C-alpha cells in the first residue's frame, strides 16, 4: 500500500510540472509591436501551405498559437512568430 501511495505521489508531482508549460511556449515569439503582426488568418494560410490542417488558432503572449494536424496525422500545437509566420516551437 505504501508503494502505491509513493508511486501516486511521484506521478502527481511529475504531472503537474508538465502542466505548467502545456499550452505555452514559455517565452514570446517576437518582440515586435502588434502593428507589425500578421492577422490570424494570414498565419493560418502559411501553416496550410506547409501542409498542416489547422483546427484552431489565436494570438497569445506575442505568439501565434495553433492547434493542428501534421502531414503524418499527429496532433500538434504550433507556436508561430506573428510577424512572419515562422514556426518557433511545437508541443
Question: Which positions does each model-derived feature cover?
Answer:
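Conserved histidines in hydrophobic membrane contexts and catalytic metal-binding motifs
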Residues: 47, 60, 66-69, 79-80
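Classic N-terminal secretory signal peptides
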Residues: 1-21
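Surface-exposed patches in mature extracellular/periplasmic domains of secreted proteins
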Residues: 54-60
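Glycine-centered tight beta-turn/hairpin loop motif at sheet-sheet or coil-to-beta transitions
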Residues: 71-73
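Short, non-transmembrane alpha-helical segments in secretory-pathway proteins
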Residues: 30-54
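Cleaved targeting-peptide boundary
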Residues: 20-30
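A short, surface-exposed beta-strand/turn
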Residues: 76-89
Amino acid at each position: 500500500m505504501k508503494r502505491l501511495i509513493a508511486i501516486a505521489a511521484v506521478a502527481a508531482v511529475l504531472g503537474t510540472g508538465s502542466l505548467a508549460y502545456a499550452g505555452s511556449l514559455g517565452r514570446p515569439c517576437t518582440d515586435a509591436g502588434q502593428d507589425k503582426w500578421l492577422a490570424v488568418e494570414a498565419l493560418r494560410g502559411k501553416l496550410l501551405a506547409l501542409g498542416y490542417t489547422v483546427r484552431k488558432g489565436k494570438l497569445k503572449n506575442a505568439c501565434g498559437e495553433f492547434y493542428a494536424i501534421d502531414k503524418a496525422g499527429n496532433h500538434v500545437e504550433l507556436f508561430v512568430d506573428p510577424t512572419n509566420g515562422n514556426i518557433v516551437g511545437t508541443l
